[in-house]
């Protein structure tokens, strides 16, 4: 029988529910259980694919091509699993499916209502996420906070699950903020008490509290919360602020969180062996050397827009025994005159993905600087496309060369729309998304990075591609297409082999990086940057 764990939040949003859920998932996995995890987002968008990164941070893409919340990146990195389209559910997606069923007459003339039709659809998503992965345990995080109007159907579905599958198979975990008032010199429990009261008013009694706090709460605070919120004192878990997020599973384990969960759900498993994870955390906490990486991006004011890129760099730093000293460079402010000032002290330059004209010329300048000064450079997605544009302009002397996305009237469309995208008008969910194979050129930097594998599978999110009409011209000038699709139509990886490291990929390598298994192309880049340290 599958066990269901539901993680809700109160008092404030962005309290760390996703990290709590991911940490618990790691602990349960290390007990030998098969775990999956999903995020419920109560916004009306179908998915975050068309949302501005300023609104929502990065869009995380799964193997099967779902555009999802960035929390899924935390889930995959912590638990080291690959999720699917059932792992991210939004209000928009549910209502869209319910309305389509109504139009097809599948409700047989019934009045379509939130209860039971919307709640049934939500419960079906929970169960489908578990069955498609054959999981012992599924953890479901509900975005936002208790009391939000948008969350009500989701919480009602969670309430109903207890009756559907039995109380021994369901556990509710509520995360809240425990604020410390410096002037009063004490922690305040009232916000948590009121949040739990609100949750209980919706028919859900939490079995565990996770309290986010800046400093240890002490047993008296835990006892008080236990008394007023009707949970066991040992089930009040502190989520202390830490220097590194990968410490959190160890902190949770030290408070027996996973054992309490297993006891409640009647799961008999051995204790979680966190030896390897603990060794990784010890290493992370004691890195002495730093390598400086300049990230030239469009959305640098919001680091969450590049969350997976940053994490992948960190993971590759662990392999090289270095911390990443990240220098954020706003591509929109980069010019030929100031590029040396902005990136001249960097040991490596990364140009990540993005969309639109703004900042593209600044990214091209950064790529030119890296090529001309032999600074290790990694381009990703749009970064790969602009690497091709830069080479066309400055080496092949194709003046006015550009991407057709950025300049539809360019005389040299080095990057053009994919053939199967030409007649598509909708923006959402229509990109080339998900896992696709890439055939690597023997003897190339890319092949070396991937331990000389012939084919790798990586996740994509793009609509435009390299225009193969220019391929021979590029190759004649020494530009190497070191990764291509198996049918040889799509150029996936490009490089200049005479440079220290000048490689760019159409796919998103960062989406498959893990703290205990860094993504290989990122690792090769960071290794080159370390060798280039000033």
Curated annotation (Swiss-Prot):
Activity-regulation annotation: Allosterically activated by GTP, when glutamine is the substrate; GTP has no effect on the reaction when ammonia is the substrate. The allosteric effector GTP functions by stabilizing the protein conformation that binds the tetrahedral intermediate(s) formed during glutamine hydrolysis. Inhibited by the product CTP, via allosteric rather than competitive inhibition.
Highest rank taxon of the organism: Bacteria
Annotated positions binding L-glutamine: 54, 354, 382-385, 405, 463
Listed GO CC annotations: cytosol
Chain ranges of the Glutamine amidotransferase type-1 domain: 292-534
Positions of disulphide bridges: none
Binding site for CTP: 13, 148-150, 188-193, 224
GO terms, biological process: 'de novo' CTP biosynthetic process; pyrimidine nucleobase biosynthetic process
Keywords linked to the UniProt accession: ATP-binding, Glutamine amidotransferase, Ligase, Magnesium, Metal-binding, Nucleotide-binding, Pyrimidine biosynthesis
The reaction(s) this protein catalyses: UTP + L-glutamine + ATP + H2O = CTP + L-glutamate + ADP + phosphate + 2 H(+); L-glutamine + H2O = L-glutamate + NH4(+); UTP + NH4(+) + ATP = CTP + ADP + phosphate + 2 H(+)
Chain residues that bind ATP: 14-19, 71
Residues annotated as binding UTP: 13, 188-193, 224
InterPro entries recorded: Class_I_gatase-like, CTP_synthase, CTP_synthase_N, GATASE, GATase1_CTP_Synthase, P-loop_NTPase
Residue numbers spanned by region Amidoligase domain: 1-267
GO molecular function: ATP binding; CTP synthase activity; glutaminase activity; identical protein binding; metal ion binding
Enzyme Commission code: 6.3.4.2
Matching HAMAP family: PyrG
Annotated PANTHER family: CTP SYNTHASE (PTHR11550), CTP SYNTHASE-RELATED (PTHR11550:SF0)
Subunit structure and binding partners: Homotetramer.
Main function: Catalyzes the ATP-dependent amination of UTP to CTP with either L-glutamine or ammonia as the source of nitrogen. Regulates intracellular CTP levels through interactions with the four ribonucleotide triphosphates.
Protein name: CTP synthase
């Amino acid at each position: 029988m599958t066990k269901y764990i539901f993680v809700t939040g109160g008092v404030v949003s962005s309290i760390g529910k996703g990290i709590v859920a991911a940490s618990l998932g790691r602990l349960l996995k290390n007990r030998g259980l098969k775990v999956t995890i999903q995020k419920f987002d109560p916004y009306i968008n179908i998915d975050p694919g068309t949302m501005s990164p300023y609104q929502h941070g990065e869009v995380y893409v799964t193997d099967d091509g779902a555009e999802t919340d960035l929390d899924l990146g935390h889930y995959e990195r912590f638990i080291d699993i690959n999720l699917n389209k059932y792992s991210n559910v939004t209000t928009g997606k549910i209502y869209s499916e319910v309305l389509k069923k109504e139009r097809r007459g599948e409700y047989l003339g019934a009045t379509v209502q939130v209860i039971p039709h919307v709640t049934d659809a939500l419960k079906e998503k929970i169960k489908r996420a578990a069955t498609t992965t054959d999981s012992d345990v599924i953890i479901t995080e509900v975005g936002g906070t208790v009391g939000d109007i948008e969350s009500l159907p989701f919480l009602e579905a969670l309430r109903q699950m207890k009756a559907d599958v039995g109380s021994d198979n369901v556990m509710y975990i509520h995360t809240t903020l425990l604020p410390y008032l410096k002037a009063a010199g004490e922690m305040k429990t009232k916000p948590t008490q009121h949040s739990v009261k609100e949750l209980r008013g919706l028919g859900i009694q939490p079995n565990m509290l996770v309290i986010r706090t800046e400093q240890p709460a002490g047993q008296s605070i835990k006892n008080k919360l236990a008394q007023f919120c009707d949970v066991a004192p040992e089930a009040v878990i502190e989520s202390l602020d830490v220097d590194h997020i990968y410490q959190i599973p160890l902190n949770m384990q030290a408070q027996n969180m996973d054992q309490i969960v297993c006891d409640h759900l009647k799961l008999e498993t051995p204790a979680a062996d966190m030896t390897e994870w603990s060794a990784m955390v010890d290493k992370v906490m004691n890195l002495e050397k730093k390598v400086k990486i300049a990230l030239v991006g469009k959305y640098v004011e919001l680091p969450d827009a590049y969350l997976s890129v940053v994490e992948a760099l960190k993971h590759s730093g662990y392999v090289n025994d270095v911390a990443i000293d990240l220098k954020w460079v706003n591509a929109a402010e980069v010019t030929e005159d100031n590029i040396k000032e902005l990136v001249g002290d960097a040991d490596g330059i990364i140009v990540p993905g993005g969309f639109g004209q703004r900042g593209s010329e600044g990214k091209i300048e950064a790529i030119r600087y890296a090529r001309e000064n032999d600074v290790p450079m990694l381009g990703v997605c749009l970064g790969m496309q602009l690497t091709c544009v830069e080479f066309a302009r400055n080496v092949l002397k194709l003046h006015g060369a550009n991407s057709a996305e950025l300049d539809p009237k360019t005389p040299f469309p080095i990057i053009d729309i994919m053939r199967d995208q030409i007649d598509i008008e909708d923006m959402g969910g229509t990109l080339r998304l998900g896992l696709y194979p890439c055939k690597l050129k023997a003897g190339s930097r890319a092949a070396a990075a991937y331990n000389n594998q012939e084919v790798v599978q990586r996740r994509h999110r793009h609509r435009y591609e390299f225009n193969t009409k220019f391929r021979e011209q590029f190759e004649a000038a020494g530009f190497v297409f070191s990764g291509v699709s198996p049918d040889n139509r799509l150029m996936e990886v490009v490089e200049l082999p005479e440079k220290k490291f000048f490689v760019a990929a159409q796919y998103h390598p960062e989406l498959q990086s893990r703290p205990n298994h860094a993504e290989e192309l990122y690792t090769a880049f960071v290794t080159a940057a370390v060798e280039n340290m000033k």
